[in-house]
Amino acid sequence: MKPGKPEVLFAPWRYEYLVAEKSGGCIFCEAAAASDGDESLVVYRGERVFVLLNRYPYTNGHLMVAPYGHEAWLSSSDAETLTELIGTIARSEKILVSAYHTDGLNVGINFGSAAGAGVAGHYHVHVVPRWNGDTNFMSVTASTRVVPEVPSVTLARLRPLFSEGSP
């Protein structure tokens, strides 16, 4: 690899995003209102929050936990929603460690477009599996991202674990 020149890996699902017409709507509100078919990528629905796959994941098993309400800030959510949010993040942690044998996780929120939020009007928490020696987040060090598992396989792996009442 030449310094300053990014490597390119094929990710066909990313191309779909780039060429698709943008609905202008909120992807989280749309997913919350959608049926539970695979197209929605919703893995779990709680009373106040839900879990869905990132359609353009950083790693295998990349989840997002979001409230049903269209809220830009944690401070906009009531205490019950925040309690369920944290509990669902903890449950997601246990499921991802069990399903993917992870060595760690990144958990984070970007508030506002200046902070990197792709959907600034509806906060969501990223839960991203990590492994010792993994090749992900290569974009930080080598301008490359590697994701070997397609989202439909991830959905088939994780949805049953959430519905079984696992961890």
Give the ranges of each region predicted by the language model.
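HIT superfamily nucleotide-processing domains
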Residues: 1-167
